[in-house]
Amino acid sequence: MRLRWTQGGNMWLGVLLTLQLCSSLEGQENSFTINSIHMEMLPGQEVHNGENLTLQCIVDVSTTSSVKPQHQVLFYKDDVLFHNVSSTKNTESYFISEARVYNSGRYKCTVILNNKEKTTAEYKVVVEGVSNPRVTLDKKEVIEGGVVKVTCSVPEEKPPVHFIIEKFELNVRDVKQRREKTANNQNSVTLEFTVEEQDRVILFSCQANVIFGTRVEISDSVRSDLVTVRESFSNPKFHISPKGVIIEGDQLLIKCTIQVTHQAQSFPEIIIQKDKEIVAHSRNGSEAVYSVMATVEHNSNYTCKVEASRISKVSSIMVNITELFSRPKLKSSATRLDQGESLRLWCSIPGAPPEANFTIQKGGMMMLQDQNLTKVASERDSGTYTCVAGIGKVVKRSNEVQIAVCEMLSKPSIFHDSGSEVIKGQTIEVSCQSINGTSPISYQLLKGSDLLASQNVSSNEPAVFKDNPTKDVEYQCIADNCHSHAGMPSKVLRVKVIAPVEEVKLSILLSEEVESGQAIVLQCSVKEGSGPITYKFYKEKENKPFHQVTLNDTQAIWHKPKASKDQEGQYYCLASNRATPSKNFLQSNILAVRVYLAPWKKGLIAVVVIAVIIAVLLLGARFYFLKKSKAKQMPVEMCRPAAPLLNSNNEKTLSDPNTEANRHYGYNEDVGNHAMKPLNENKEPLTLDVEYTEVEVTSPEPHRGLGTKGTETVYSEIRKADPDLVENRYSRTEGSLDGT
């Protein structure tokens, strides 16, 4: 019975409200109170599935009225209202017929009287167990490989329900198949079960698990009706021919047969397997046949499988073949031989009958129809050898023997990819190669006496090694292969390594300050470099070297025996060798050289300079006084010839060039120098007044005492110019040589 409002619930609610209104009007005159309220479950709070359950709500009400008041009773399950009633009775009941799991829950009831309300505590009700499920089948007879649909349901319960369906063989307790499924929206499931080839009479069981909140109630397991299974084809059977002992060489016949019922829609596939190998099969009949000449290789377990869609039936048999003769054995004197050694092979059968035929083969090709083979080995004899022995139709192949004939290596050649010279640090490839000889070939490269690297080559191609030599080095390689001879050494490869020029430096051997006349020695050196090295010496601001030399040395010297001021300046040098890139000379530092004079030379030069200065001064002074003297005499001679002043020896008396008697204020040396110039030298017209002044000069005689005096009269010409012009005068002076 569903716990919810009926469709007439609204009507009942109206009636209850009306009754409550009336009660309230009456209550204005009477007093009411709810003393207590509680619930009772009959037969109890725990009931079994399918039992009836009664819910009672018991109310104790007190009133001043002589008539019992009408009150409202409401029933709740898990806080959801499912039933209400108006009553004047103290007890109201709600009946549940055949309680199920979903009726489990927490119940309570509420009483409403006028505006007063009281609710009971919650009462937990548990319905234990699940009603038994129902199992139905879509058929009770089925053919092998068919499908049976099984439906399991619990109509009385509400979902979700978890169903477990199991398949059993009749009278067998073990479960053949088990399947589970949960129905979330219904209380039944339908599952399909395939009928297998071993099934004869089968049945199914069903169990329902009802999930309610956190609780799960499990039903009893209910079995279905029996299902009869019919065969679509029989189990396969083997037929072996010949019967009894089968000897190698006999024709072996293996046949697998089945019987197909009329209910089968088509023939199944029949497969014969030797171990896992399929040797015969058939799809259009009731048998499959495998026929072959018997050998011991056919000793095996044979399986016959019959398969049709979902059905597979299997049968097995062991077939034994008696050996006619043993497998031949091939042996050799050695498996690795040097070229030219003797190769011997022999084939044998333990207890072989005389009629056995032998053939020795190499790589599947016949070499000799005999039991033994002897020959001188060559490299082309390398390969895989077998022996074939036959008696009648039975042919057997021996084990394989791998023969390797090794040709001796030729002397290996050694070479590298660069020229005769290698620049330091450059990677070179050194190759070793033996033209003749059996591969694989093992090469070892020696650098000096040390092993540099090893390499295995699977052909006669050269082995290539890489190295970065930093100095002159010798390489040698050793080649070896399978031959018993020791490793074959090559000739020695000598590689000359050229070190590029590094760190060019220019220095002076004595001092950067050189005394004039002493030697200058410049040294251009390199830290490292292979000769010959070209050195070029430069003076700064000069495009061409003043000295160039090529040496097999890491230094070069330029020597100047006697230095002069011309050698003073800044110097640098360039150096290069064959390892230097084209036009890429390395430049040194710049060196400043100063040339100074020797002290004695400085003194000599000073003396010479002083002497020259003195000489120049003397010459200048003499020239000056001579010029001055001429300037004094020249105007007098132009006026009249003056009588020479004679001393006591009748010699002319000359004025002392150092005297200052004739130099007086107004004297113009230029006038004296130019006294010979004509008057019309000046282009402008001049008005001149000429006066003559008598000058008496007294000069002492150099060879007489100061008391002796001489007098000379000199006439000077005085020209007067216009006032605008400069006035030149020649004053008349009288004096004596003694200055008085």
Swiss-Prot record:
Q: Where is the Ig-like C2-type domain?
A: 35-126, 145-223, 236-315, 328-404, 425-494, 500-592
- Motif residue range(s): ITIM motif 1: 690-695
Fetch the SUPFAM superfamilies from UniProt.
Immunoglobulin (SSF48726)
Q: What stretch of residues is annotated with the motif ITIM motif 2?
A: 713-718
List all topological domains (Extracellular): 28-602
* Keyword terms of this UniProt record: Cell adhesion, Cell junction, Cell membrane, Disulfide bond, Glycoprotein, Immunoglobulin domain, Membrane, Phosphoprotein, Repeat, Signal, Transmembrane, Transmembrane helix
Q: Where exactly are the transmembrane stretches of this chain?
A: 603-621
Q: Where is the signal peptide?
A: 1-27
> Cellular location of this protein?
Cell membrane; Membrane raft; Cell junction
The UniProt GO MF terms for this protein read: transmembrane signaling receptor activity
Intrachain disulfide bonds:
C57-C109, C152-C206, C256-C304, C347-C387, C432-C477, C524-C573
Record-linked Pfam families: Ig_2 (PF13895), Ig_3 (PF13927), Ig_C17orf99 (PF17736)
What's any GO biological process attached to this entry?
A: cell-cell adhesion via plasma-membrane adhesion molecules
Glycosylation sites recorded in the entry for this protein = N52, N84, N284, N301, N320, N357, N372, N436, N456, N552
Chain positions covered by the region annotation Membrane-bound segment which detaches upon phosphorylation: 711-731
- Region Disordered, residue ranges: 697-740
Q: Which residues lie on this side of the membrane: Cytoplasmic?
A: 622-740
Describe the protein's quaternary organization and the partners it interacts with: Trans-homodimer (via Ig-like C2-type 1 and Ig-like C2-type 2 domains); trans-homodimerization is required for cell-cell interaction. Forms a complex with BDKRB2 and GNAQ. Interacts with BDKRB2 and GNAQ. Interacts with PTPN11; Tyr-715 is critical for PTPN11 recruitment. Interacts with FER. Interacts with CD177; the interaction is Ca(2+)-dependent; the interaction is direct.
Q: What is this protein called?
A: Platelet endothelial cell adhesion molecule
What is the scientific name of the source organism?
Sus scrofa (Pig)
